[in-house]
Amino acid sequence: MTHSTAKPVPSARRLAYQALYDVLEKDAYSNIVLQRILAEYPLKAEEVHLLTELVYGVLRKYNHLLWIIGKLSTQKVKKLHPSVRILLCLSLYQLLFLTRIPESAAVNESVKIAKKVTHPGNVRFVNGVLRNFLRKKDSFRIPSREEDALLHDALTYNQPRWLIEDWQNAWGVEKADAVFSAFNEIPSMTIRVNPLKQPAADFEKLLSEKGIEAAPIPYLPEGFTIKSGANHFFGTFLKEGLAYVQSASSMVPAKVLSPKAGETVLDMCAAPGSKTTQMAEMMGNEGSIDAWDLYPHKIALIKKNAKKEGIIIIHAGARDATKPMPAVHEKYDKVLLDAPCSGLGVLSHKVEIRWRRTREDLQEFPPLQKALLEEAARYVKKGGTLVYSTCTLNSKENEDIVTAFLRDHPEFAPIDFQLEGLGASEKGMLTIWPDQAQSDGFFVAKLEKRSEE
């Protein structure tokens, strides 16, 4: 007689609860948590879909859900036990936005989970709040802009009030609304074909043969937006290094730097290696790329990705890029500084960032970015190119950093560039707007170190 030792597979709702707890209470990242869960449990396709829908859905609607809980609860939302708050959000999201799910299933499953993760008093509270919602569900109307503009926008766009206030003041209400709306769209999968293993034209044909609908990205010869059949990429294509999942905007800095075969290149803040491997592929695996990052485990990830993609020109090492390294002064033809930043351009797929950042946090980044750019400038050869990029839309981390740098460094000049579908740079600087690019928000600046005359 044989006995199965297979671990029981929890329901999608139970796993969604755990994922949300890790993200909201332990500062984990949603994409990493979901990857771990999917690697651990053999879920059916419909369970995977429900799990991801619940996790990302709750994070996208978090403000709205907490507001409703506040209307229903006799206790202040902030004082509720985290397990209670998360279970209520999980249930209310299903009741409000997933109409195909029966109300009884959403409520009963949450009560069942509550019995496993908290004490009987909290179980009764969860059950009571949800039953109360079902009685009053048609009475929860978001205030109009005329009644309370800031609350209306915070609940409609599910962004923190301080960010709505800051961006509406900076860009005007219409532009800010368009950006916030874009952040709440579910992002399409975009991939970069590895030309070292398969030319882009051949890969497009392969996609078509497998019934995968894909559209080329106009400004990226090796880039494709996957319209349908994305599940194929979590098999052969990625494991064999034929393609790499990367946002379209994230591919732009390397495109603008435009490294050539035989050149020496530095990627100063390289992990996880997406731009590093992209540059190596652009160089045809000829030349040399030094890839730095602060943490050894991230260096291991760069090496792993390079090996999988068949790249031999990347030399990755742990370095504190804020510390001077005279040995490599004016060594490189091209330098990419994709600087650490507030991440306020990637709120569509790193949804939780909006709930973690504060206005005060934004003050931490410019001093670091300025220090890194000062070091980057030393490593570029005369006549060489330096690209500075971030994945934020905060001008103090973008235009202000580059403008101040150019004022202090007359040996550098901005170089204008143009990309199909994204427009032209101004004074060597380009902001990629998520509402226009249907991708992440990014900032890219291209500078040249003048040759001595």
For the regions a protein language model found, what residue spans apply to each?
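S-adenosylmethionine
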Residues: M1-E453
